[in-house]
Swiss-Prot record:
Keywords from the named record: ATP-binding, Chaperone, Kinetoplast, Mitochondrion, Nucleotide-binding, Transit peptide
SUPFAM superfamilies to which the protein is assigned, alphabetical: P-loop containing nucleoside triphosphate hydrolases
Similarity-based family: Belongs to the ClpX chaperone family. HslU subfamily.
GO biological process entries: mitochondrial DNA replication; proteolysis involved in protein catabolic process
One annotated Gene Ontology cellular component of this protein: mitochondrion
UniProt protein name: ATP-dependent protease ATPase subunit HslU2
Native source organism of the sequence: Trypanosoma brucei brucei (strain 927/4 GUTat10.1)
The encoding gene: HslU2
Compartments in which it is found: Mitochondrion matrix, Kinetoplast
Length: 496
């Protein structure tokens, strides 16, 4: 498959600040991740973690691949006009809506945030502003950008850290040597001569020799190094100030920016000092400008925003209980989803044109057609997620790469307990989960956690009684552990 020009991906980062070779290398690697990921392959990877919901996987796989296709287009004007097709996932809770989106973002290490629509209010009402969604996305992108830049400069930072530790080690040796010479004058001639010989041999150690032996011969030697310590306490602007303008003015005046760290001299052993020196070296090699430039590129070009419970801010048009604030949230989401420039607290701007928005909701009491028409038009891809059946629950227990039963086996292994689930136990777990969901509130696959924990309660608490033994969980054990749940009429009192 043809590799695309990675320069287009990092163009926005270079527009914000001169992109360093590190930023360019990372954006190139980020862009090339999608080269060999066809929609079919993306769906296949998602199959390893999520059972069923083929239509949902298909939709996000196409959206992810469309990002790659857009970057192949040479005509810049045409490429600018091709926008992501935002997605609306409709289905009950616990069927995999969030997990599909999260795994899709994780597949390409894209910045990802999950928010609930009910947490936001219309501008002018008490509550969070929808533009804070982009602030959260940018914060997530900065974390990823910082980590990637540090990985890119890891070898260089390690070399610099060794130099810092070596200089501290050498200074410490020199100081102890000058102190020792004055005290040894009154001591035994033979012993002082031997000490002088050892001291002299260490004083003559070169940096290359130190690099070879710092893990063995010199690891317990003491060194003195300077490290940067961040001041304790809240260094952010007053939380009650929500105005972007006030924050920007504060930053310009030096009131709202993050406080710089204070240099502190510490004495450590060589093996303890090296991690501190490495972090110190990384802080020199990776500056805030590089992090911000890369974070902006990642957020704008690869960001994914998952808005859950979108149906909770939708009311029937003729309803007497229509909430004007909830309708206003839909209105406020329009420019965000359509594409606009959002001003962040630090005064910089993030374009939402190419951010992928995935909205989801159960839509039990309202219909998707009850959303305001403009919002419907900005969510052109709609996917119906089906409720989980007993067979789906059974597959969820066994098929995902890191399924619940595998997790329980690994946890018990740490207690030297060999745990085994028989096939009829898996069937019984699926049956109980399905029945409880049918008789109580249906929370989908999340119910499995409650049922499995009820079964494992005895072995988790009394683990010392089963140490060194093999524990076999069959259908009878499951029935005994969950019998009180199944025999109760009002299951809601006992289940989440």
């Amino acid at each position: 498959m043809i590799r695309f020009s990675w320069v287009r991906l990092c163009s926005s980062a270079m527009a914000a600040a001169a992109a360093s070779p590190d930023v360019q290398a990372i954006t190139r690697a980020q862009a090339m991740q999608l080269d060999d990921l066809s929609p079919r392959k993306i769906a296949s990877i998602l199959d390893s973690y999520i059972v069923g919901q083929a239509e949902g996987k298909r939709a996000v796989a196409i959206s992810l691949r469309n990002r790659w296709r857009r970057r192949q287009i040479e005509d810049e004007g045409l490429r600018r006009d091709i926008l992501p097709k935002n997605i609306l996932l409709v289905g009950p809770t616990g069927v995999g809506k969030t997990e599909i989106s999260r795994r899709m973002a994780k597949l390409t290490e894209a910045p990802f945030v999950k928010v609930e629509a009910t947490k936001y209010t219309e501008v002018g009402f008490k509550g969070k502003d929808v533009e804070s969604i982009i602030e959260d996305l940018y914060s997530n992108a900065k974390t990823k950008a910082k980590r990637r830049l540090e990985i890119e400069r890891e070898k260089e930072a390690h070399e610099l850290a060794l130099e810092i530790v070596f200089n501290g080690w050498h200074s410490c040796r020199s100081a102890s040597g000058s102190f020792g010479s004055s005290t040894r004058n009154s001591g035994s001639g033979d012993s002082s001569a031997e000490e002088d010989k050892n001291s002299s041999s260490r004083d003559n150690v070169t940096f290359e020799e130190f690099k070879e032996k710092y893990k063995t011969q010199f690891k317990d030697d003491m060194v003195v190094i300077d490290v940067t310590q961040q001041p304790k306490g809240n260094t952010k602007p007053n939380a009650s100030i929500n105005s972007v303008e006030m924050l920007s003015v504060g930053i310009l005046l030096g009131l709202g920016s993050e406080s710089r760290g204070v240099k502190t001299r510490v004495t450590k052993r060589v093996e303890e000092a090296l991690p501190l020196a490495t972090q110190e070296a990384l802080s020199r090699l990776v500056d805030e400008t590089q992090i911000s430039a890369l974070a902006r590129t990642l957020a704008e070009q690869d960001g994914v925003v998952f808005i859950d419970e979108i149906d909770k801010v939708v009311t029937e048009p003729a309803s007497a209980n229509a909430d004007v604030s909830s309708t206003g949230v839909q209105q406020d989401l329009l420019p965000l989803i359509e594409g606009s420039n959002v001003t962040l607290k630090d005064g910089s701007q993030i374009s939402t044109d190419n951010i992928l928005f995935i909205c989801s909701g159960a839509f039990h009491t309202v219909k998707t057609s009850d959303m305001i028409a403009e919002l419907q038009g900005r969510l052109p891809v709609r996917v119906e997620m089906h409720a989980l059946k007993e067979e789906d629950i059974r597959r969820i227990l066994c098929e995902p790469k890191f399924n619940l039963l595998l997790q329980q086996k690994a946890l018990m292994k740490t207690e030297n307990i060999d745990l085994e689930f028989t096939p009829d136990a898996v069937d019984e777990l699926a049956r109980v989960t399905t029945k409880v969901n049918a008789n109580a509130q249906n929370i989908g696959a999340r119910r499995l956690h409650t049922v499995v924990e009820r079964v494992m309660d005895e072995y988790s608490f009394n683990c010392q009684d089963y140490e060194g033994k093999k524990v076999v969980i069959d259908a009878e054990v499951v029935r005994k552990a969950t019998g009180s749940l199944m025999n109760n009429i009002d299951l809601a009192k006992y289940i989440l």
